[in-house]
Amino acid sequence: MRVESLKTTLNFIFKYLTLNIPTMNKALSIAAAALIGCASINAEAQTMIGKTTNVAAISKGDRMTPETLWAMGRVGGAAASPDGKTVVYQVGYYSVKQNKSHQMLYTVSADGKLQRTLTTTAASETDAAWIEGGKRIAFLTKGQLWSMNADGTDRRQLTKSDIDIEGFKFSPDGKKVILIKSLPYHESIQKNPDDLPLATGRRITDLNYRHWDHYVESVAHPFVADVTENGVDDGKDIIEGEPFECPMAPFGGVEQLAWSPDSRTIAYTCRK
């Protein structure tokens, strides 16, 4: 939207620009200011939140302060490669100023001597898992499933789902993958009328309307998708039409689903 507004402003300036030098200078100054402003907005949007180099400097003396805690990275999930020589893990960094976080992926050798940063952009990358016998790493970013070499190169987008993917688990033979997606659910909380999309009031019709920190207006379902050379398809909902969630909120994850060794059967946890 800002880019289109900038184009409109520049077109207006140059359309009505005359050969009057003072007018020209003024117009060019306005155009330059607009360009600088747009560049600043883009630069801010791309700011990468990463590791704080000197956490101790943030502390007040030898005290542990809230600022110190926010400056520390928070280690998330970790997975060892099939040969046991490398571990891929996730670390979250936070910016109090921007009020947002950034999840990054790293690898480290089992002896701790060789560490590599895989995430190099401002987009968060999460849920890393080894695939193809340890040759590649699958992960989530911007709601889609991706894969990359173990050194972070050759990144490929595997899915193009209209619904954000929240988790995944590949079958042992690598030919299929479970994708976790949340679907709209309005059995407990009535959907807002079409002419009042921004209404904040809720009409609750069932006691199971909330999970700790969020209202139940969607439920997670597992989809089984085929893995091909062209990527991963949208998959089939294995509990289609059922008003249940799998994994189960508020604490469940992909650990509540498991493939059989022959990749033919899925065991899952669901409250029915």
Which positions does each model-derived feature cover?
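Sec-dependent signal peptide recognition
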Residues: 25-33
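Boundary at the C-terminal end of the N-terminal hydrophobic targeting segment
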Residues: 43-45
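Predominantly five- to eight-bladed beta-propeller fold
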Residues: 47-52, 102-103, 179-230, 236-240, ...
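Multi-bladed beta-propeller domains
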Residues: 49-74, 100, 107-124, 131, ...
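Beta-strand-rich domains and repeat architectures in extracellular enzymes and scaffolds
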Residues: 67-103
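Conserved beta-propeller blade repeats
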Residues: 72-87, 120-138, 155, 162-180, ...
